[in-house]
Amino acid sequence: MENLNALVDAALAEVEQAGDIRALDDVRVKYLGKKGEISALMKGLGKLSAEERPQAGAVINEGKQKVQDAIADRKSAMEEAALKQQLASETVDVTLPGRGELPGGLHPVNRMRRRIEDFFLRLGFDISEGPEVEDDFHNFEALNIPSHHPARAMHDTFYFGDGRLLRTHTSPVQVRVMEQGKPPFRIIAPGRVYRCDSDLTHTPMFHQVEGLLVDKGITFADLRGTVAEFLRYTFEVEDLPVRFRPSYFPFTEPSAEVDVGCVSCGGEGCRVCSHTGWIEIMGCGMVHPTVLEAGGVDAEEYSGFAFGMGIERIAMLRYGVNDLRLFFENDTRFLSQFG
């Protein structure tokens, strides 16, 4: 047992002298490992008598426990000291300004769509939606565009093999609303539409908003006032010049194209307005009686107006964008301007 006491004292001294955790582990292996000096004493217990063996084993285990506790305490102290040193060397200066986060923002097309919806919701209109994959009846026939009608040439349509198609405008939503309800109707139908066209001012997919109001006694004067007020709200120009030019659409009669005074040059004439001082903005007209009848509305009792516009077109003019394709390229340098 005297040898045990000497080994324990030597082990405790080396634990205190260990300069790092690796040296401390070397001490553990030297005295407590499988071939360690204190562990070797356990092998000598077999030479003792049965009466002496339990007492001797207890003494050896007590010595081993002292060394283990010393190693654990020393290791804990080393780790705490290392942590304090690390924290001291990595001190954060809380007075420095934060990095912050880059905030997101609405896409300019969504921003414009919400602005359009907000205006018409204030006027008591509802927002209606419909399928993007349409049938020929709702996209053409019900809108007074039969199969032989030359107006179909104005729509570069994507067809499926079963005769269905990708809608070329959101007007089919108006027909479906009339089919499913009873007048009066006050709705706008925003959504994606598809046409086989692609250049600086056209893409195969774009967004439209079409509006419909059907009630008793509706006249072109109601249409004119609604559209003019909407355009002044959209471009935030109180005295924005607005003019209506006679035009043709198979689903309205009479029909008109709506122009606004160029918001870039104030009507002086520039590249944006082709030096005319006016910019074509949307189409509109009084709903054709044939369309009302196709929707199950009595054209003798009710009348209404409809209008339609491309959201990207409005956004291009509102935000001064000269290439429609910029809206779809997802270039953050472009989109961040609208955040």
Curated annotation (Swiss-Prot):
Record keywords, A-Z: Aminoacyl-tRNA synthetase, ATP-binding, Cytoplasm, Ligase, Magnesium, Metal-binding, Nucleotide-binding, Protein biosynthesis
Cellular compartment(s): Cytoplasm
EC category: ligase
Enzymatic reactions: tRNA(Phe) + L-phenylalanine + ATP = L-phenylalanyl-tRNA(Phe) + AMP + diphosphate + H(+)
Molecular function terms, GO-annotated: ATP binding; magnesium ion binding; phenylalanine-tRNA ligase activity; tRNA binding
Gene Ontology cellular-component terms listed: cytoplasm
CDD domains cross-referenced by the UniProt entry: PheRS_alpha_core
Cofactor: binding comment: Binds 2 magnesium ions per tetramer.
PANTHER family the UniProt entry points to: PHENYLALANINE--TRNA LIGASE, MITOCHONDRIAL, PHENYLALANYL-TRNA SYNTHETASE
Identification of the protein by name: Phenylalanine--tRNA ligase alpha subunit
